[in-house]
């Protein structure tokens, strides 16, 4: 049974091009499920019944797992059984008509532009090359709206300050080129010219942002850095995701259209961008209609100033 799980994870990597973080999440969710099923002595995946699935979901509920966690694990299990059915490893799919718990989507609140400005100035109070590094990281994260996983995955070769552009590899290995201008470009240039060489121990790591050992900074490392600055501002709930959300909200408030923000964030669907930015459903529908029928009349109906 474990072998088929490994084959499924390999399929997600090779065939679907999912990122390492996503694969790791699938493994975490499905490992627990596999252990549960093995203990029930079902013998093979073809013997797993709907009752087994319901028993697992009840187990998670009794263990007081968050509804969002249960919903995510249900989705992973469904994907796994769809794969098994496609491979003819099972004849019937026990996850058909299996309902996932409804999850309320709690999005982080956007901080104000003034709060962003305060945050971006704080690294200047940190002495040494780390201050310039932190300044560059925060500036780039807010200026581009990229995910923190994308930020720490950047290599020096992804930056082209001559044309003010950063190459970013997003979900499903989709590449997008993001503009980097103004204070973000200046901060990044200063970091590269002055600080990075001081932080780098052997000069061999291609990573753009380095930790104190000269190695690639991790997501957890960035989180600790951000948390330290956020607490100094009294913003204890600030997360990297909050900065991404603030970027999108502020872009719309400045008159950027929904499609442009969608492309910058790397969203496959505009509905995701609509949820991210608290844009009304009616506004998104109007934009879709205008995009499908690009007439002057329709374009005039779409209002993007907030």
Curated annotation (Swiss-Prot):
Cysteines joined through disulfide linkages: none
Any one Pfam family match given in the protein's UniProt record, by short name: Phage_int_SAM_1
PROSITE patterns noted in UniProt: CB, TYR_RECOMBINASE
Compartments where found: Cytoplasm
Active-site residue list: 147, 171, 241, 244, 267, 276
Domain (Core-binding (CB)) ranges: 1-85
Domain Tyr recombinase: 106-289
Source organism superkingdom: Bacteria
Keyword Transmembrane annotated: no
Keywords: Cell cycle, Cell division, Chromosome partition, Cytoplasm, DNA integration, DNA recombination, DNA-binding
Chief place of localization: cytoplasm
One GO biological process term: chromosome segregation
Matching InterPro entries: CB, DNA_brk_join_enz, Integrase-like_cat_sf, Integrase_catalytic, Integrase_recombinase_N, Integrase_SAM-like_N, Tyrosine_recombinase_XerC/XerD, Tyrosine_recombinase_XerCD
GO annotation, cellular component aspect: cytoplasm
Coiled-coil residue windows: none
HAMAP family named among the record's database cross-references: Recomb_XerC_XerD (MF_01808)
Role this protein plays: Site-specific tyrosine recombinase, which acts by catalyzing the cutting and rejoining of the recombining DNA molecules. The XerC-XerD complex is essential to convert dimers of the bacterial chromosome into monomers to permit their segregation at cell division. It also contributes to the segregational stability of plasmids.
Protein family according to the UniProt entry: Belongs to the 'phage' integrase family. XerC subfamily.
Assembly with partners or alone: Forms a cyclic heterotetrameric complex composed of two molecules of XerC and two molecules of XerD.
Name the record gives this protein: Tyrosine recombinase XerC
Organism of derivation: Herpetosiphon aurantiacus (strain ATCC 23779 / DSM 785 / 114-95)
Gene designation: xerC
């Amino acid at each position: 049974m474990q072998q088929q799980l490994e084959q499924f994870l390999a399929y997600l990597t090779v065939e679907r091009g999912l990122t390492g973080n996503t694969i790791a999440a699938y493994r975490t969710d499905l490992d627990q499920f596999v252990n549960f099923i093995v203990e029930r002595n079902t013998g093979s995946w073809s013997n797993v019944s709907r009752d087994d699935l319901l028993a697992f979901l009840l187990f998670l509920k009794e263990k007081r797992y968050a509804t969002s966690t249960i919903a995510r694990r249900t989705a992973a299990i469904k994907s796994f059984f769809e794969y098994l059915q496609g491979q003819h490893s099972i004849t019937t799919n026990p996850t058909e008509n299996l309902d996932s718990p409804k999850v309320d989507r709690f999005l982080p609140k956007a901080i104000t532009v003034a709060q962003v400005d305060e945050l971006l100035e704080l690294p200047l109070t940190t002495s040494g090359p780390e201050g310039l590094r932190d300044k560059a990281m925060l500036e780039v994260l807010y200026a581009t709206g990229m995910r923190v996983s994308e930020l720490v995955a950047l290599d020096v070769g992804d930056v082209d300050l001559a044309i003010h552009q950063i190459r970013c590899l997003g979900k499903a290995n989709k590449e997008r080129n993001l503009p980097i201008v103004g204070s973000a470009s200046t901060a990044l240039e200063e970091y590269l010219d002055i600080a990075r060489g001081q932080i780098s121990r052997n000069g061999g790591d291609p990573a753009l942002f380095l930790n104190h050992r000269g190695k690639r900074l991790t997501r957890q490392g960035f989180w600790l850095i951000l948390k330290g600055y956020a607490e100094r501002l009294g913003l204890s709930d600030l997360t990297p995701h909050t900065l991404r959300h603030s970027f999108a909200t502020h872009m719309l408030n400045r008159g950027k259209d929904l499609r442009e923000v969608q492309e910058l964030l790397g969203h496959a669907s505009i509905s995701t961008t609509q949820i991210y930015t608290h844009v009304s459903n009616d506004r998104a529908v109007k934009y879709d209609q205008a995009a499908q029928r690009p007439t002057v009349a329709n374009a005039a109906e779409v209002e993007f100033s907030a």
